[in-house]
Amino acid sequence: MPWLQVRLAITPEQAETFEDALLEVGAVSVTFMDAEDQPIFEPDLGTTPLWSHTHLLALFEADTDETALIAHLQLLCGGTLPEHHVERIEDQDWERSWMDNFQPMRFGQRLWIVPSWHAAPEPDAVNLLLDPGLAFGTGTHPTTALCLEWLDGQNLDGCRVLDFGCGSGILAIAALLLGAPQAVGTDIDPQALEASRDNANRNGIDPARFPVYLPADLPQQPAEVVVANILAGPLVSLAPQITALVQEGGRLALSGILAEQAEEVRAAYAGAFDLDPTAIKDGWVRISGVKR
């Protein structure tokens, strides 16, 4: 059935007031959306982060009286509404619409990330089957893409790979499919470890080839290749630990870094690594190098 959709342009300070008001006047769903494609990083503990410019979308039953709705919202919110737009939208197959947003993606020369509902575009290529899920990492974000492209360009034969902050396991699984005999994953989120196991199983990876650990349980065995796609702050603060996990002569790739954060991260690793030129994609960077 069709719906009445109300879109409000709000600030984070207005979010709770308008969310409560929309629910009080009968909204069946309320959604916050980024109005300007702004990333959110490392929010303070106990906070719910919102973008500085946020769209609040609310859906109402199709027979809702639009004029009365807006008047009631104005009354509840104490006067003038912020910039807003009201439209009627047709119902659709929301699951199919969501699935259509995720298409097979190629990284480098050999590697494809393929959702399970799609046929592989190149059956003879290296195809990693992965669906969007609760853990971070599907290949759509520039930082994941930078790491996947880097892995595709490496000779991983005989290498043990460590995925530091493994999320969905996408980087470790890609490394295994690209020729690494073993990969290890670690993440602070137990749900991420479960997602990594599930995704490895979907790709036919023997669990013995891809053990995953919480950080406290991670064996302190240096690896030939380490990838860490997390955030700039942790990459800097954890530089001694990450450096120790790369064996001498081993290779390191770091991402989750904005371009303006690159120099700080490079400085944290320059003492132990011969660093490559910084790779940039859509305002994000990858820093890689070889341990001396």
From Swiss-Prot:
It is found in: Cytoplasm. Its EC number is 2.1.1.-. S-adenosyl-L-methionine binds at residues 144, 165, 187, 229. One of its GO terms (biological process) is methylation. It catalyses: L-lysyl-[protein] + 3 S-adenosyl-L-methionine = N(6),N(6),N(6)-trimethyl-L-lysyl-[protein] + 3 S-adenosyl-L-homocysteine + 3 H(+). One of its GO terms (cellular component) is cytosol. Disulfide bonds: none annotated. It comes from the Bacteria. SUPFAM superfamilies: S-adenosyl-L-methionine-dependent methyltransferases. It holds the Pfam family PrmA. GO terms for molecular function: protein-lysine N-methyltransferase activity. Keywords: Cytoplasm, Methyltransferase, S-adenosyl-L-methionine, Transferase. Its main location: cytoplasm. Methylates ribosomal protein L11. HAMAP family: Methyltr_PrmA (MF_00735). Belongs to the methyltransferase superfamily. PrmA family. This is Ribosomal protein L11 methyltransferase. The gene is prmA.
